[in-house]
Amino acid sequence: MPAVFMLASSSALQCGRGVPRFPRTEVGAGHSVNEETKAEKVGNQTSVIPATSRQAALGTSWTQRRTQPLQERSHWHPRGNNASGMGGHRMFPGPLRGPAAQVLENECGSLGRAAEGRS
């Protein structure tokens, strides 16, 4: 059970870490406004191309950001005796301990159970 919780909390932390990153890409959002105004002059097809390429670029940078903390965590947090029960609780910041954390735990808890069933 503690192993499942550790897995759930680490993936929940990852979910939580990914959420604030999206609003920070407002530079890209502002960029799309420029693209749309250009597209009105030229035509619809021009707006389609930059949007997809921007999404592709966003996708790659997001996956890189997402895998990096995982690799770091695996160094100082092997899935062995270190996975003590309270260690998982410490991963969650204080303010998050609420309905939002509950939702994250529920979603990622099912992920953990699925992963445990697979192994």
From Swiss-Prot:
Localization per Swiss-Prot or TrEMBL: Secreted
| Keywords noted in UniProt | Glycoprotein, Secreted, Signal
Query: Superkingdom of the source?
Result: Eukaryota
Where this protein primarily resides, as one coarse class?
A: secreted
Q: Does the keyword Glycoprotein apply?
A: yes
Where do glycans attach?
Answer: N44
Provide one Gene Ontology cellular component.
extracellular region
Question: What intrachain disulfides are recorded?
Answer: none
Q: Where is the segment annotated Disordered?
A: 23-100
**Residues in the signal sequence:** 1-18
Q: Could you tell me where the Polar residues compositional bias lies? A: 43-71
Protein known as: Uncharacterized protein EXOC3-AS1
Q: Which organism is it from?
A: Homo sapiens
